[in-house]
Amino acid sequence: MSEDKSGSFYSMYKLCGQLEKESSHSGKTQLIKSFCNVFKGDLYLLAKLMLCKEDKRVFRIKDKAMLKICSHIWDCDLDDMIEDLDNGDFTETCKKFYIEYGKYPEKSTLTLKEVDQVLDSLTVSGKFEDQVKIINKLLKRCTPFDFRLVCRIIDSDLKINTGAKFFLDAFHPQAYDAFKKANNLKGVIEKIQQHDFDNDNGDGDDGDGDDNDDDDGDGDSDSDKKKKKSSGGSGSDSGSKKKSKSFEVAIKLMTPIKPMLPKAVKTVEGVVKSSECFYAEIKYDGERIQIHKDGNQFSCYSRNLKPLMPWKVDEVKPYIPKSTKAQQMILDGEILLMDTKTSQPLPFGTLSAHKKNGFKDATVCVFLFDILYLNGKSLIHLPLKERREILEKNVMVVKNRIEFSEVTIVNGASEKSKLTALLNRVFKEKLEGLVIKDAMSEYEPGCRHWIKIKKDYIHGMADSADLIAVGGYYGSGSMGGLVTVFLMVCYDKQNKIYKTVVKASGGLDDNMIAKLQPKVTSTMTKISKEVSKIPYWLDCPKQYAPDFIVKDIKQAMIFEIESAEFTKSDHHTTGYSMRFPRILKIRHDKDYKTATTLEELVEIGKDIKIVPVGKGDNNSPTTTTTTTTTTTTTTSSKLIKKQQLSDDDDDNDKDSKQQQQEPSKLKFVSDDLLDPFNDKSDDESNKIFILNYVDNSGIWNEKGLSGAIGKKWPSIPKSFSQGDSNIIKSGEIRVEKVKDDSISTNKKVFICNLSCIIPPKSKKESYTFSLKEFKSAIKEAKGAINQKKASVHLAKPQFTSPSWSELDEVLTKELYNSGIKVFVHSISKSSPTTTSPTTTSPTTTSPKITSPSSSSSPSNKLSPLKRGRDEKLEHEIIKDIEPSLPIFEDVNAVIDSKTIDQVDVKRLINSIKTMGGRVSDKWQQVGIGKTTHLICNGMSDLYLHVDRLGGTIVLPNWVDQCFGSDKLLPLHEDYIYFNKKDHPDYSQSSSSSSMSIEEEKIVVTTTSDDPSEGNQQQQDKKVIKESKIIQSKDHSSTTTIDTKITITSTNNNNNGNDNNKTRKKQHLLSIFQECIIFLHDNVNDRETLKRYIIAYGGDISDSVNDKTTHLVASLPNNFSNVKPKDLFKSIINNNSKNNNNNNNNNNNGIIVNSLWLWDSINMSDLLDVKNYKLF
């Protein structure tokens, strides 16, 4: 048997350890270069294992499967391993339990070749018994640290933050580019060895000056990319081209090439500026396929460069030789299911469904869009225009089996309308989107130099719904131990049950995930995916059983979920799901009753959104002529057929048809609604009516459009609120004239308040917009508008019902048809400095309004907020008026039901929760469920308890006032409850002074029994200060509430006269009376705990001495790595020396877990320490 010279696996382990510690890019590359200069093993094997993310082998073992194998070998509890896995990385779990197992070699003897052979054997071993044998054999040769590294290779993540670029740049500056193009690691390594590590720029820098390794996959700076586009080449100079050519690695048949990819843009403008001439290709909603043909042999690869499953391609394989006579070729395309009756692609996911059920009228079809290799020659350096010609000359269309992608040639910005029309057609036909390609561009493997534009990329066109988060799942990797994925559901009114829609995690950053954990802990209970523990009110499939489930649906969080589209799904119990879901925000203003229902979800899914036609588009039609180089007739006939089909669909959808044939007669503009006479205004009228929506309560709304009006013209809300005339009956109007010196004397603005908002009958309900009252108010307003010969300006209301088309119909019928001009204000598509009115479709977004302070400066205009649907609503207009956080976000209140009526208790609970706060049943001073406010209106035991602990105690009217004013009010004496008369801790003095609550000094006195103290006052604990900082709603200021409690110790002979009220000696309970306690620094919330100990009769020791009775630390009972005595070792040793010097007895007390203190407090009794002893 020949000697294994592949190299030591332990040496690779040491290299990984160094790379994990090194943070700089150049440092990592230098470490690799230094290591490989002395490495005598197989460099290709080393590269193969180090670049495990590039290894396309399928090992058939996931994290929990590996734990199951290991638990079987080590005879340990699988549940314990899974529980440990919940805390993070499964590779760490494997290492930890391997160490506990104890039977492992002391020294690593594995070689790289042996590890590679083990990995190869795992790719062909699908049975559990075979996998156990392979892993068991491996474990006999490797240490726990070796095994962790093997597991990381299997998991394709070495956790060293070192990609292919870092590794290959250590050898040659062109090595990574060659690898990207050919995806042939062995060929690259052989080339490196031929160059004998000659490296002119092997510092690991990608040459773009941005310290980014894999940001775009091409290593170009922004300026380089611009050069690349202008030149039509790769963006390199002639010298670098020469270098690249000298290092070029040939494309190899049957070795997949990294696909060229598109990057996202969010506007049509961003596309048309990308090139003077580009191909706009239909983006088919299937799976990427790369076909390699070598004679009669075929291989098909996925986007991830892995072989496609045979069942996906077997149907279409026989048609490949029928479509071409070429012997060798590499084709790029998309595989999907085609409806043979309509010749229309079927939605994403149907290909998998076809495997199980089969579709009678559907076939598997490949849409080809590129050719990379032909008869021994690479074509990737040719421009796209030439490659497309070669593709169409060498491949013939086989109907519904082999097709070409549909292409529209667009000549830059001059043909923007053609692109807009094509997009509208794509979205209406529910295709995925478009891919934009520069006609003169090369094929650059792994680079994102194409552009993709999809519905969910265009601002506001994505589908969204407010769903209920009823379950949570643990994250993985660095997010292990945190709940990062949520099970989203909606309510099925017909069947009276909650049904699943989607699992969502995207959209949350690390900070938001951390913020959500306390909410998860307090409102959810752990069920560890046990189906039997799913509540009766939730219809949840077994495979979606979560790690956590909400305790009470009323406490569930509401998330706004945005997605590319709604799709039908057999996996979720609603029958629907969402593609590419992401969490936009938490809806603190909604609860389980006001979240999207299943019926509403179905309606949202029917919605077809249209891209606004921009200025100069001349109302282009929604169809377009498409051409390719040689298949113009085929493409055009297909387009006509698709247009006929879309027309047929319109017959079934009256509203959609009407919208297409009869566009809105109203004028959609992008001007500032509150500045209608600006220079850019398209309105020539000298008198303007601005419509404002109000209710019949007589109270001016300080939010939304009303709030913006009040800020700019304060006289309007003031006039509105004067006398009894401020109450406007539903369906009626009231007109207020604007007084503004900045408006020319010959021009006038009127605010027309329409009473069409119906206020809620209770706090549980919400405001609604009445179409009936809106019609009535508009009819009444028409007379006033005609009398003044004015035009009308308005914003779309903030309500999703009624629909805008219904309001459009009323405005058109009553105003436009009566000769009144109507302007609907929307978001500008251009920059603030060049904003101009644009005529758009009715689905254009809503108005932009500047704040009063910035109205004169276009550059200071507020940017529009993100829309959740296709229409931006009124409440999204002003960012200052609609802050993102609820005003009671940091409030967790306890309501004293003994001092407040039950009716008021319910009202307070609803108010607090509506404003984003929480309500708890009992007072909790610290921890996740820490309470912040006690709400009471009289003397009670609960009041005394919280008062003695220095808690914040408020009257119910504070909550009511905050709710009414919609802002967090500062706590002053009108809101703070403090009962001095009946308080048992206070004694009356003959000459007590009347002091305000802020000025009053509260003194807690105790009587000393030690005669040696004489008349000297001893201050035991001087000041305990608790400062509660409550963020105000707009985050611009904070309210600080300081509670100072001075605790002094005075002897019986104190002759001082105190005219203020003084507290008597008073303890809640004397449960710690005999205890002198030392708190270690690691104890959580030490200051609060000190206060509790003192309040409950105990004493605090600042150092360990012979009088100390208890030493307290925060450690779990089942600690393993830290010995509790070690925590106090230095303290005890120092104390022992002092005691020996003083000839004192050495009694250091008992070391106990801090839980002993908390449990004793909660049980109101001194518990036995034996269950809490740590030493």
Curated annotation (Swiss-Prot):
Residue span of region Disordered: 195-243, 612-669, 829-869, 984-1036
Biased amino acid composition, Acidic residues: 199-221
Main location (coarse class): nucleus
Positions with a binding annotation for ATP: 281, 288, 303, 437, 448, 452
Keywords assigned by UniProt, alphabetized: ATP-binding, Cell cycle, Cell division, DNA damage, DNA recombination, DNA repair, DNA replication, Ligase, Magnesium, Metal-binding, Nucleotide-binding, Nucleus, Repeat
Cofactor field: Mg(2+)
Binding residues annotated for Mg(2+) 2, in chain numbering: 432
Reaction catalysed by this enzyme: ATP + (deoxyribonucleotide)n-3'-hydroxyl + 5'-phospho-(deoxyribonucleotide)m = (deoxyribonucleotide)n+m + AMP + diphosphate
Stretches with biased composition (Polar residues): 1004-1018
Active-site annotation: 283 (n6-amp-lysine intermediate)
Subcellular location as annotated: Nucleus
Domain of life, per lineage: Eukaryota
Entry-linked PANTHER family: DNA LIGASE 1/3 FAMILY MEMBER, DNA LIGASE 3
Stated name of the protein: DNA ligase 3
